Structures are given as C-alpha cells and as structure tokens.
C-alpha cells in the first residue's frame, strides 16, 4: 500500500479589488485613465466592497442633487425643461443625481448636449463616466462600450463643450466634462477620497474577516490530521473533500493533512487559537472614521452614530457645515454650464435656476409660516408677501417651485 501525504487548503475564490496589479496600456487615440486604463472600473468595484465608503458616496450624490429646483415660474419653457430634459423622460434632478454620483465616485462626470442647427430643441443625457475617455487631441471625448477591447470604428467622438459638431442623425452634439482638480493630473479628475483607499481596504478586509468567521460557524481555525491509508491520489482527494464538508464549515478555514495509517487511529484536530478580535474591531472603527475624513464628509449625514448616539442638533449643525463647505460648491459647479447651455439654446433666462436644499431633519415646526421661519433664521422677511404666507407643511410637499 503506497504512502500518500496530502495537504489541502482551499483558497477563497472572491477577488480582492484592493490587490489589483495594473498592466500599463498605451494608445495613440486616447489618454488612458489609470496606467491600465481601468481605474474607473477599479474604483467602481471598490465602492461595491465597502459599506461605509458606498454609503457616503450615495449620500453625497443625494445631498448635492438637492430636493428639486426653484426658478422664475414666468419662464414656462424653463419649467417644462426642468420637468423633462430628454426623450427618456428624466427630470433635471434625476439627471444631476447620476452626474453627482459619478463625480463623487470617480472624480469625473459627463453630460451630453443634443440640439440642432436651428436650436429648436435641447436634450441633456448623462453618460456613464466609465465609458468615457479623453481623446489624444484633448478636445474630444471618446465613448466606447468595451474598453477591454477598444475599436476606433465602434467609438463615438463628441467635442468638449462649448464646441458642437454635426452627427450622422443631423443633430449637433457636445459633451460637458466635470472633473475634480488634482495637481499633476491634466486629463482626468481624481476623487477627493483617493487618500482613503488604504483605510477603505481595511474596512473591506475586516468585513471579510467577519464573514469568514460567520461562514465557519465561528469554529476555530486549525489543522485536521486524518490517520488513514490510501492507495492513490484520487482516494486522498476524495477523503479530503469529504472531511471538508464534514468539519470545516467554510473551505479555507481548516487545513487537512492525510498521513499513512496505522493500527491505532491517531486522527486529531489541532486548533489555532488567536485573541485578536479586539484588534480587528478597533481597526474597523478607525478605518470607518478615516473614510469619513477622506471624503470630507460628516458621520451623522450617513447614518454613522457617535458614542453618545444621534442628536438632531448635531445633525443640523453638520448639515449646515456640509452645505457651506461641500454641497453648495458642487451644486454651483454642476449648474453653471447648464444655465449657459439653456440660455444659449432655448433662449430663456436661466439665471434664476437654483437647487432646493433641505436638512435631513426638521428644525422648525411645520405650522410656522415661511416669513416666520425666515425671521427665525435671521433672513430678510416680509409678513405681507403672499409667497411667504405658506405654512412649512405646505412647501415641504407642494409648490416648491413657487417659493423664491
């Protein structure tokens, strides 16, 4: 009977996006986005692996895209455009929510502008930033469905705004490229949280560690020595597979060793003990705190409580800080070129177009009137102004566009 020594440890099949190693890509047609031109896909994958990281990106996009818009209601054409900006039936708010999400996630976002030579219509379309690359002339954006297998004949080239170029369907098209400035990066923006990728990896791996413990039914890891004689490699493989299903809970948590059998069965399990639970929990807590800082964001605005719990005053205070340091600046960047496009193509004054921002929790009773709320906030108010006679309960649900 032959002697077979078999050691088996099953490796976790889940791909770790943080261990990505890029292969450099060169092209004469576009500027690569990352050394392998796949940085946006990597950032997208990372956002799907870290709960806190993803929650902050979602919340930033929601806050930046606001709760609606105020504008001059006498501009009927402007009102209709805000209600539907393209043939897909999207509102301006829905469009800008996608744009704000891309910009928060990737540091870049794109809006396609469609019109004709007579400016008889205007449509705006969000373009998935992962499909866009800056052309080598730095004056066009290339759109392609598969950057793993780029083909110039399948790519669509659009000029950067304010230039327009005619297309095969008779329309004139252009594209707006929003990007977060970063020294040394000319063609693409860099997301503000880039310095926090390391701590995002820690949060991801601590989550993965907890999942592994759960899959293993919280059994200790260790080495299982099976005292059994086998005739060939196939029998050894079968024995290890059966033992995995019986003992390991989750493949990869237990290493199996099959050794030559003897008259006495000396099979035994040798646990590998560790007392590092506290270290992992502290790492996860610190990583969560650092992710919030890297995003220039605030804990209470993303459902992350403090040791003292949630407090409405703290939420309102952090919202005010976020509004003045992050939200308003991002909103201004998004709206400025759109106001210009609307005015130039539709011929209406879009200067009155502004976001409506509301805190995540009410700070005033809903039975107050608008002029009373403005007085309480130290703003100009007029008790005789008809527009300020609405109760807060009314404008939180209806007629948002009528409040100046």
Predicted regions: what is each one?
Residues 296-298, 369, 380:
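Helix N-cap / loop-to-helix initiation motif
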Residues 287, 322, 337, 369-372:
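A general alpha-helix detector
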């Amino acid at each position: 009977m032959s002697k077979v020594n078999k050691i088996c440890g099953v490796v976790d099949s889940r791909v770790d996006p943080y261990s990505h190693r890029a292969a450099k890509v060169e092209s004469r047609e576009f500027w690569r986005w990352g050394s392998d031109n796949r940085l946006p896909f990597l950032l997208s994958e990372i956002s799907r692996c870290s709960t806190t990281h993803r929650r902050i990106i979602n919340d930033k996009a929601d806050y930046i895209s606001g709760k609606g818009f105020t504008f001059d209601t006498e501009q009927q054409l402007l009102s209709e455009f805000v209600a539907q900006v393209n043939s897909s039936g999207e509102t301006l708010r829905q469009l800008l929510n996608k744009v704000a999400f891309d910009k928060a996630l990737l540091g870049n976002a794109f809006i396609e502008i469609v019109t004709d030579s007579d400016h008889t219509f205007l449509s705006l379309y969000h373009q998935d930033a992962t499909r866009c690359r800056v052309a080598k002339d730095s004056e066009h954006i290339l759109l392609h469905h598969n950057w793993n297998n780029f083909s110039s004949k399948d790519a669509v080239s659009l000029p950067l705004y304010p230039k327009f170029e005619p297309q095969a369907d008779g329309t004139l098209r252009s594209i707006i490229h929003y990007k977060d400035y970063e020294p040394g990066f000319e063609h693409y923006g860099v997301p503000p949280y880039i310095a926090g990728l390391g701590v995002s990896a820690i949060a991801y791996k601590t989550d993965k560690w907890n999942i592994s413990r759960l899959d293993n039914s919280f059994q200790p890891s260790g080495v299982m020595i099976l005292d059994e004689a086998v005739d060939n490699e196939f029998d050894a493989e079968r024995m290890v597979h059966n033992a995995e299903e019986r003992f390991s809970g989750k493949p990869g948590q237990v290493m199996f060793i099959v050794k030559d059998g003897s008259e006495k069965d000396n099979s035994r399990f040798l646990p590998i003990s560790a007392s590092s639970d506290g270290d992992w929990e502290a790492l996860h807590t610190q990583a969560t705190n650092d992710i919030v800082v890297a995003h220039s964001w605030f804990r209470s605005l993303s459902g992350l409580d403090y040791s003292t719990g949630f407090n409405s005053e703290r939420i309102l205070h952090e919202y005010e800080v976020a509004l003045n340091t992050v939200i308003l600046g991002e909103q201004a960047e998004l709206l400025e070129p759109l106001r210009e496009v609307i005015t130039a193509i539709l011929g209406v004054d879009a200067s009155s177009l502004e976001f409506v921002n509301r805190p995540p929790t009410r700070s005033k009773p809903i039975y107050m009137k608008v002029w009373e709320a403005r007085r309480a906030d130290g703003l100009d108010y007029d008790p005789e102004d008809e527009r300020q006679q609405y109760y807060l309960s009314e404008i939180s649900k209806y007629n948002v566009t009528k409040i100046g």
